[in-house]
UniProtKB/Swiss-Prot annotation:
Protein name: Glutamyl-tRNA(Gln) amidotransferase subunit C, mitochondrial
Protein purpose: Allows the formation of correctly charged Gln-tRNA(Gln) through the transamidation of misacylated Glu-tRNA(Gln) in the mitochondria. The reaction takes place in the presence of glutamine and ATP through an activated gamma-phospho-Glu-tRNA(Gln).
This protein's UniProt keywords: ATP-binding, Ligase, Mitochondrion, Nucleotide-binding, Protein biosynthesis
Organism placement in taxonomy: Eukaryota, Metazoa, Ecdysozoa, Arthropoda, Hexapoda
Listed EC numbers: 6.3.5.-
Amino acid sequence: MLRLLSKRLYCKIATKSNEKATKLDFKQLTHPTKVPQTPVDAEFPDTSSSEIQIDTKTIQLLERLSLVDLDSERALATLKSSIQFANKIAHINTEHVRPLYTVLEQQQLQLRNDQVTEGDCRAEVLRNAKVTDEDYYVSPPGNIPLEQ
């Protein structure tokens, strides 16, 4: 097993115990450029009193598009609470807010050189798949449980 790991460059790097791992300096992350230090007040409309009504046609459409079974009461309650939350945050004023791409804006990302270390390992990769068809993975259909 160790011989197999030593062939791959990324495994060599992971198995070296004498190299120090790059750690995040959380003291530097106290105030990234676009994240405010203090919370911004926002007024949310009170939507807890209004009951969300979803017709069966909409539920069937959501089930088909998301491949999620919404037949249980728990799933419907989760969907309704998600809609209430979305209604709350839809009223937040974001007019003068710059887009945030990452919370770790001041942290440098360490990249390795993009070099091919091994090639043509298709057969080895396909051995990880439970079901294959003509050198392709076969994924399970939707939310149908797989046979054990």
